[in-house]
């Protein structure tokens, strides 16, 4: 998360003293649209699942925007303001540890994210990576009753139509461990113990 404009906290402010400071954070704000009325719920649920499973993703939350009259999705920016991660090169993607890649792929299958590509995975050359942009996952752009819409898609199997994970494969053993991790609902500690 990027934080700017630091201001010291006064003795009587919430948060105390001891060198505390107030700051401004850079966030991305997303709203539902007529074409996709599920952006906010898709992002929120996918983010919470990723965090619970220990999958690297920037922290996000709901924000009730009074001017819009409905909740919006806000997510912390990674990097410096105005200096966003470019789409990672293949070398950066391959530097992501195999077990992390396998877990990210299993996560995409779980939430039925058919929109994974190099522009919505942030990666550097040191193996650090974060999955972002899940507005088309889960409920997709279902415009009717979400429960009925989900039932109509229960037999879908191709979560990687763009071939992103096929071009960045993990071994079958790593995939099996990632799938077991997700099925067991383990977080970061559970995954670390299965290496």
Locations of regions flagged by a protein language model:
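Conserved kinase catalytic-core segment
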Residues: 91-143
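Short, low-complexity, polar/charged sequence segments that are solvent-exposed and flexible
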Residues: 47-51, 92-96, 149-153
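Conserved ATP-binding subdomain of kinase catalytic cores across diverse folds
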Residues: 1-85, 107-113
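AlphaC helix of the protein kinase catalytic domain
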Residues: 85-91
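Glycine-rich loops and low-complexity Gly/Arg-rich segments
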Residues: 52-55, 82-83, 98-100, 154-158
């Amino acid at each position: 998360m990027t934080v700017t404009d630091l201001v010291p906290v006064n003795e009587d402010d919430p948060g105390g003293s001891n060198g505390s400071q107030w700051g401004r954070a850079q966030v991305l704000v997303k709203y539902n649209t007529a074409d996709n009325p599920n952006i906010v719920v898709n992002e929120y649920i996918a983010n919470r699942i990723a965090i619970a499973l220990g999958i690297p993703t920037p922290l996000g939350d709901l924000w009730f925007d009074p001017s819009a009259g409905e909740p919006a999705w806000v997510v912390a920016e990674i990097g410096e303001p105005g200096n966003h991660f470019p789409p990672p090169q293949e070398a950066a993607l391959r530097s992501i540890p195999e077990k992390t890649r396998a877990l990210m792929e299993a996560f995409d299958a779980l939430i039925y994210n058919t929109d994974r590509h190099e522009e919505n995975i942030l990666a550097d050359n040191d193996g650090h990576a974060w999955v972002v942009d899940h507005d088309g996952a889960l409920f997709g752009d279902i415009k009717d009753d979400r429960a009925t819409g989900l039932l109509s898609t229960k037999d879908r199997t191709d979560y990687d139509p763009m071939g992103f994970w096929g071009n960045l494969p993990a071994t079958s053993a790593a995939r099996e461990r990632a799938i077991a991790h997700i099925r067991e609902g383990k977080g970061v500690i559970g995954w670390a113990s299965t290496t």
